[in-house]
Curated annotation (Swiss-Prot):
Keyword NAD: no
Function: Transcription factor involved in the specification of the lactotrope, somatotrope, and thyrotrope phenotypes in the developing anterior pituitary. Activates growth hormone and prolactin genes. Specifically binds to the consensus sequence 5'-TAAAT-3'.
Native organism: Mus musculus (Mouse)
Name of the protein described by the UniProt record: Pituitary-specific positive transcription factor 1
Subunit structure: Interacts with PITX1. Interacts with LHX3. Interacts with ELK1.
GO molecular function: chromatin binding; DNA binding; DNA-binding transcription activator activity, RNA polymerase II-specific; DNA-binding transcription factor activity; DNA-binding transcription factor activity, RNA polymerase II-specific; lncRNA binding; sequence-specific DNA binding
Gene Ontology process terms (BP): B cell differentiation; cell fate specification; cell population proliferation; determination of adult lifespan; inositol trisphosphate biosynthetic process; negative regulation of transcription by RNA polymerase II; pituitary gland development; positive regulation of cell population proliferation
Predominant cellular place of this UniProt entry's protein: nucleus
Annotated region of DNA binding: 214-273
Motif (9aaTAD): 5-13
Database matches in SMART domains: HOX, POU
POU-specific domain ranges (all copies): 124-198
């Protein structure tokens, strides 16, 4: 392989310690001219020149997103940038475009501000975490006490807020398996639902209690009063309202008690007569069959 001598039109001056301060350095070839002229290099240089903001590190997908496990996993992630974002397969971003667009500048400032917030981890011993865990435990206990299942809660929330709520959502919240941000949002919704559910339960219990109070206690009739009522029933099984009032005053009972006793006594008499007639009929039938 033959070697060719290097020729150039540039002039090189040997600099010593005295001349270095007086003579300026001049370079006739820029860095861009030294690179091969290809589309690949042009795209790389243009892309690198066009991007003026640093890409924040994203922990989404690398660390668990649950709270109650480790502090580093509580950091929310705003964006997930693919690995090929800065590759040469994308068209170059020109410098004048980003420099003259005020929206791009605002976007970069907002991204820097949010990236600083992303980097701040949440303390696992913070009051917010403890309050969230306490609410999740209390919610489960109160939900079971009210008689609702996780499916009931998920369907109730889905009917109001959309289909993203389900039994799985409630289960993950109670087991502390949601991200801190989503858990805080769901906490406010579940707190409102729990308040309304307890109000409905209180109204239902009040209504049931009122119905139970309307039902009177069973009245106990003494043996002497029963004998007196039996004698009156033998004389007249269907007394009038005046007769019932008079018997109630004599026996020191309420009029309604005496009236109900006569109704029950007539029903019992009717059942006895019906049973007796059926027995007599069956006996006579057997007697005829024997002949």
């Amino acid at each position: 392989m033959s070697c060719q001598s290097f020729t150039s039109a540039d002039t090189f001056i040997t600099l010593n310690s005295d001349a270095s301060a007086a003579l300026p350095l001049r370079m006739h070839h820029s860095a861009a001219e030294c690179l091969p002229a290809s589309n690949h290099a042009t795209n790389v240089m243009s892309t690198a020149t066009g991007l003026h903001y640093s890409v924040p590190s994203c922990h989404y997908g690398n660390q668990p997103s649950t709270y109650g496990v480790m502090a580093g996993s509580l950091t929310p992630c705003l964006y997930k940038f693919p690995d090929h974002t800065l590759s040469h397969g994308f068209p170059p971003l020109h410098q004048p475009l980003l420099a003259e667009d005020p929206a791009a500048s605002e976007f970069k400032q907002e991204l820097r501000r949010k990236s600083k917030l992303v980097e701040e981890p949440i303390d696992m011993d913070s009051p917010e975490i403890r309050e969230l865990e306490q609410f999740a435990n209390e919610f489960k206990v109160r939900r079971i006490k009210l008689g609702y299942t996780q499916t009931n809660v998920g369907e109730a929330l889905a009917a109001v807020h959309g289909s993203e709520f389900s039994q799985t959502t409630i289960c993950r919240f109670e087991n502390l398996q949601l991200s801190f941000k989503n858990a805080c949002k769901l906490k406010a919704i579940l707190s409102k639902w729990l308040e309304e559910a307890e109000q409905v339960g209180a109204l239902y219990n009040e209504k049931v209690g009122a119905n139970e109070r309307k039902r009177k206690r069973r009245t106990t009739i003494s043996v002497a009063a029963k004998d007196a009522l039996e004698r009156h029933f033998g004389e007249h099984s269907k007394p009038s309202s005046q007769e019932i009032m008079r018997m109630a005053e004599e026996l020191n009972l309420e009029k309604e008690v005496v009236r109900v006793w006569f109704c029950n006594r007539r029903q019992r008499e009717k059942r006895v007569k019906t049973s007796l007639n059926q027995s007599l009929f069956s006996i006579s039938k057997e007697h005829l069959e024997c002949r």
